[in-house]
Amino acid sequence: MPFSHYAVLDGDNFYEARKLVGESDLIVLAGGHVPTQNAFFQKIRLPELLRDYGGVVLGISAGSMNMAATVYAQPEEPGESSPEYERFIPGLGLTDVNILPHYQKVKDYTVDGLRLFEEITYPDSEGNCFFVLPDGSYIYQDEERLLLCGKGYSLADGVMQQLTEDGEILNLNEE
């Protein structure tokens, strides 16, 4: 699919958000710090701008996390293990799926001396379901399908369960 034009929407041209979104066929939500990106999306009213958007939205890393209606902002920076840190924040509302990317990279991380998964994320999964994905795996969603492509896990109510291996595709609508 060749394209002849692209634009970056960031803090330098945020005032053009409505125009840029309206002219786009494809929107790529890049990675970064989830709450920082989320605050920018709220500032430019991206949830509202995407309500009637007819193109494709592709999320990468933090961008995929912020696509959810309610985003789980998994702690990653010093101080974010604190009970005052807001871990569940309003997202773009494009999906109900919560993705935790880069599993192979972050599974052994600690934040403020706490093990990221065992002592923070597992307890936060009580009453929630997170899809934990290593790099190379992804979720594909359209009007009819919700597919887990590649190796992936579910983390719900404190229990992590492997759902797929590399190269496999699982229709999550049938689960």
Region roles according to the model:
Residues V34-K43, Y109:
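Glycine/threonine-rich flexible loop motifs
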Residues Q37-N38, A68, P75:
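Glycine/Thr-rich phosphate-binding loops of Rossmann-like dinucleotide-binding domains
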Residues M1-L26, A30, Q161-E168, L172-E175:
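N-terminal beta1-alpha1 cap of cysteine-dependent amidohydrolase-like domains
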Residues L20-E23, K43-G55:
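Catalytic-core regions built around general acid/base machinery
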Residues A30, R51-T70:
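Catalytic nucleophile loop
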